Each structure stands twice: as structure tokens, then as C-alpha cells.
């Protein structure tokens, strides 16, 4: 059996903190306003994985009202979510992530993002695709007010 999940996340810029996307710290003059580290790529991916396994969403599993998740590294959330997906007997077939940002440029960081995600999910880097696009200066991402991200995860039942 195969299952597909879709995730979406968005965060506004506005805090003097590191900008972390896909687990990678990206040099930029500002970071995200967020309860956790604000990693839009990992949040969207976590939602996609949870959705594919019918386990709800990131807010259900890691509510932003819980102080234990304040400023947490989103890689920890991703790893825990995937552990729960695995308990239902699923494994990753492939992941596709689209980062929507006018700036900063993502291309120099995508290979590092892919490798970190592959390591965290114990899968091959060829199962992880990440791409970036702009909105041609339209909307909040185009005005440089924040970044959005979509992720799709395809899961398959583990074979013994």
C-alpha cells in the first residue's frame, strides 16, 4: 500500500535569530517569527509525513502552546514524527519539497538540506528532492516578508 501526504508552512521574517531552512543555517539579516526555530521546510515535510500516515499534523503532535517546543530544533520534531510513521509500518518512497522565497537564494544550500533530511530519515539522498522558486515579487514572499514551503511525501508499507 502507498500513501501520499501534503504539507504547507509559512513564517514571516522579523526576529534577530538564525534563518534555518531544511535544517541548514542560511546567512541572512533576519530570521523567522516562530515558536520553534521556524524551519518552514521541515515543518511542511513533517506535516506531509504525518498526513500520509493519517497521524494528524505538526500542531497536534507538537502544539505551540507547549513550552517544551519553544525554540526547538525542527529536526527533532521531524525525527519524532517519522518514528511515529514507522510504527504504523510505513517507510519513505520519496519526498518533494518546494521552497517559495524571493530571498535569500536557496540553490547554494539545497544539497546540504537534502543530505541532512536523508540522514535524519535514514533514507537515500536520491529519495529527497528540494527545489526553490520565487513568486516574481508578488505577494508576501515576493515582498520579502517571509517564506512559504510545500512538501509532498510518498510512503509505502515496509516489506519484511
UniProtKB/Swiss-Prot annotation:
Q: Which GO terms describe its biological process?
A: isopentenyl diphosphate biosynthetic process, methylerythritol 4-phosphate pathway; terpenoid biosynthetic process
Leading EC class: lyase
Q: Where does a divalent metal cation bind?
A: 9, 11, 43
In this UniProt entry, which residues are annotated as the site Transition state stabilizer?
A: 35, 134
Q: Could you tell me which InterPro entries the record lists for this protein?
A: MECDP_synthase, MECDP_synthase_CS, MECDP_synthase_sf
Cross-referenced NCBIfam families, in alphabetical order? ispF
Q: Subunit arrangement?
A: Homotrimer.
Name of the protein this chain belongs to:
2-C-methyl-D-erythritol 2,4-cyclodiphosphate synthase
Where does this protein come from, organism-wise? Haemophilus ducreyi (strain 35000HP / ATCC 700724)
Amino acid at each position: 500500500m502507498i500513501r501520499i501526504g501534503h504539507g504547507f508552512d509559512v513564517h514571516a521574517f522579523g526576529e534577530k535569530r538564525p534563518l534555518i531552512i531544511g535544517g541548514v543555517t542560511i546567512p541572512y539579516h533576519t530570521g523567522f517569527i516562530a515558536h520553534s526555530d521556524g524551519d518552514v521546510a521541515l515543518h511542511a515535510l513533517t506535516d506531509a509525513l504525518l498526513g500520509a500516515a493519517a497521524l494528524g499534523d505538526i500542531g497536534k503532535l507538537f502544539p505551540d502552546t507547549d513550552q517544551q517546543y519553544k525554540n526547538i530544533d525542527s529536526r527533532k520534531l521531524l525525527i519524532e514524527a517519522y518514528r511515529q510513521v514507522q510504527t504504523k509500518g510505513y517507510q519513505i518512497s520519496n519526498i518533494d519539497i518546494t521552497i517559495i522565497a524571493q530571498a535569500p537564494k536557496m540553490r547554494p544550500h539545497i544539497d546540504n538540506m537534502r543530505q541532512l533530511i536523508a540522514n535524519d530519515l535514514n533514507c537515500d539522498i536520491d529519495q529527497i528532492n528540494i527545489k526553490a522558486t520565487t513568486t516574481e515579487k508578488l505577494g508576501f514572499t515576493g515582498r520579502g516578508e517571509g517564506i512559504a514551503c510545500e512538501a509532498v511525501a510518498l510512503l509505502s508499507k515496509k516489506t519484511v
